[in-house]
From Swiss-Prot:
Top-level taxon of the source organism: Eukaryota
Organism of derivation: Mus musculus (Mouse)
UniProt keywords, alphabetically: Cleavage on pair of basic residues, Cytoplasmic vesicle, Glycoprotein, Membrane, Phosphoprotein, Proteoglycan, Secreted, Signal
PANTHER family xrefs: SECRETOGRANIN III, SECRETOGRANIN-3
Residues carrying covalently attached carbohydrate according to the record: 40
Tissue localization of expression: Expressed in various brain areas, with highest levels in the arcuate nucleus and the lateral hypothalamic area, as well as the paraventricular nucleus and the ventromedial hypothalamus (at protein level).
Principal cellular location given in the protein's record: cytoplasm
Protein name per its UniProtKB record: Secretogranin-3
GO biological process, one term: protein localization to secretory granule
Lineage per the UniProt record: Eukaryota, Metazoa, Chordata, Craniata, Vertebrata
Length: 471
């Protein structure tokens, strides 16, 4: 038994001492640090880069390596890597020492507005407004100080440029640039187009109003070549001279120098503008019939209004607000409506002037006097019939008057029956749905609007109002 216990203890001692002899210790402290560093997962990045570069150098130049290099120990390789790493670290430190002052210098120069080369061109008042002040902003979407414009300012600026340059391509260029940069979407581009079109119409109306105000003021247009005092030319005199002496006198068109694009488009004094109105037969016939000096002012106003409306329709067609067919239809209605309204307005004066052309001379016989009176009465009757016709003033006035009256009575009778049916069948319904007082006010407003547009005569409108007021 004692022998067995002694043998078991010897076996335990052998097992405990075996693992210690199986794993030898490192020979030196340097090998131990290298061993620990290789086992570590957090090696410095610089060492990894240097080691990779050293491997590349060895692979690229295998023939230049000496036979003794294969006998180098890991300690020599580590020293080589350390030398390369230290060299790279020193170079990076030198670059970092040099770079901060340079960066600071650039920042100081950027912040210093006096060193900006673009300021000379920006504040040069001799340059045109189309020479854009920012190289990265060729469409001029910045203010003078460089701050971005608001949405309303951009819309107004685009509309102004389209009006000044008379070119739709300006809008397309700006929108395509904004779309390419991703600043707006397709829907926003359509919205912007509507807003620009609205702003352009307001701008045209504003310029037209300003131009009409300047027509009332006499202005000195030119100066004689001999150095004389400039002549005062009023718009009325210019129109009269241009219409009566178009073949012989060309000084009027030469003296009327226009300053902006709107005046070039709406100037009634030019000969070619007056000839353009020949394409509107009703209006042109009305103009040629106005010859008296008292109606010269009326004639000038009519030409200005008609030219402004024609150019406005052209602009709407050009920029896609309305179709060309709608523009032609609108111009045809415009020609007929303005001519008819003006003729009705001047009817009283025209009748008086015509009646004065047929007085009863004292030296004529009684029969001749009676025939003259009959002719004058006929003319008054014909001109009076124009009040009852709003559709066609070139056809037989008597027949058209009867037809217009019959249509009016039938129309009024239909209104009367419609209202009676509403009163009869709406006893249980909501009274507010067919409130006659509200309907009466609405009909009165519509009738007045139709009178202003020339759709109804004043007598027809009054008849409609009486029917609704009697219910």
């Amino acid at each position: 038994m004692g022998f067995l216990w002694t043998g078991s203890w010897i076996l335990v001692l052998v097992l405990n001492s075996g693992p210690i002899q199986a794993f030898p210790k490192p020979e030196g402290s340097q090998d131990k640090s290298l061993h620990n560093r290789e086992l570590s997962a957090e090696r410095p990045l610089n060492e990894q880069i240097a080691e990779a570069e050293a491997d590349k150098i060895k692979k690229a130049f295998p023939s230049e390596s000496k036979p003794s290099e294969s006998n180098y120990s890991s300690v020599d390789n580590l020293n080589l890597l350390r030398a390369i790493t230290e060299k790279e670290t020193v170079e990076k430190e030198r670059q970092s020492i040099r770079s901060p002052p340079f960066d600071n210098q650039l920042n100081v120069e950027d912040a210093d507005s006096t060193k900006n080369r673009k300021l000379i061109d920006e504040y040069d008042s001799t340059k045109s407004g189309l020479d854009h002040k920012f190289q990265d902003d060729p469409d001029g979407l910045h203010q003078l100080d460089g701050t971005p414009l608001t949405a309303e300012d951009i819309v107004h600026k685009i509309a102004t440029r389209i009006y000044e340059e008379n070119d739709r391509g300006v809008f397309d260029k700006i929108v395509s640039k904004l779309l390419n940069l991703g600043l707006i979407t397709e829907s926003q581009a359509h919205t912007l187009e509507d807003e620009v079109a609205e702003a352009l119409q307001k701008l045209i109306s504003k310029e037209a109003n300003n131009y009409e105000e300047t027509l009332d003021k006499p202005t000195s247009r030119t100066e004689n070549q001999d150095g004389k005092i400039p002549e005062k030319v009023t718009p009325v005199a210019a129109v009269q001279d241009g219409f009566t002496n178009r073949e012989n006198d060309e000084t009027v068109s030469n003296t009327l120098t226009l300053s902006n694009g709107l005046e070039r488009r709406t100037n009634p004094h030019r000969e070619d503008d007056f000839e353009e109105l020949q394409y509107f037969p009703n209006f042109y016939a009305l103009l040629t019939s106005i010859d008296s000096e008292k109606e010269a002012k009326e004639k000038e106003t009519l030409i200005t209004i008609m030219k402004t409306l024609i150019d406005f329709v052209k602009m709407m067609v050009k920029y896609g607000t309305i179709s060309p067919e709608e523009g032609v239809s609108y111009l045809e209605n415009l020609d007929e409506t303005i001519a008819l309204q003006t003729k009705n307005k001047l009817e009283k004066n025209t009748t008086d002037s015509k009646s004065k052309l047929f007085p009863a001379p004292p030296e004529k016989s009684q029969e001749e006097t009676d025939s003259t009176k009959e002719e004058a009465a006929k003319m008054e009757k014909e001109y009076g019939s124009l009040k009852d016709s709003t559709k066609d003033d070139n056809s037989n006035l008597g027949g058209k008057t009867d037809e217009a009256t019959g249509k009016t009575e039938a129309y009024l009778e239909a209104i009367r029956k419609n209202i009676e049916w509403l009163k009869k069948h709406n006893k249980k319904g909501n009274k507010e749905d067919y409130d006659l007082s509200k309907m009466r006010d609405f009909i009165n407003q519509q009738a007045d609007a139709y009178v202003e547009k020339g759709i109804l005569d004043k007598e027809e409108a009054n008849a409609i109002k009486r029917i609704y007021s009697s219910l």
